[in-house]
């Protein structure tokens, strides 16, 4: 599963903008 780069959350989290995913 991809993560929200720079943030301790998953890319699926509403708080993570798609552009932050890696």
UniProtKB/Swiss-Prot annotation:
Keyword Iron included in the entry's annotation: no
Cellular component annotations (GO), alphabetically ordered: extracellular region
Subcellular location: Secreted
UniProt xrefs under InterPro entries: Conotoxin_mu-typ
Modification sites for Cysteine amide: 22
Disulfide linkage: 4-16, 5-21, 11-22
Tissue expression notes: Expressed by the venom duct.
4-hydroxyproline carried by residues: 8, 18
Keyword list, A-Z: Amidation, Disulfide bond, Hydroxylation, Ion channel impairing toxin, Neurotoxin, Secreted, Toxin, Voltage-gated sodium channel impairing toxin
Record-level Gene Ontology MF annotations: sodium channel inhibitor activity; toxin activity
Annotated transmembrane regions: none
Chief location of this protein within or outside the cell: secreted
Family from the record: Belongs to the conotoxin M superfamily.
Comment field on protein domains: The cysteine framework is III (CC-C-C-CC).
Role description: Mu-conotoxins block voltage-gated sodium channels (Nav). Intraperitoneal injection into fish (1 nmol) provokes weakening and difficulty in swimming after 20 minutes.
More details: Authors confirmed the assignment of this toxin to the M superfamily by cDNA sequencing.
Protein name (database record): Mu-conotoxin-like pr3b
Origin species: Conus parius (Cone snail)
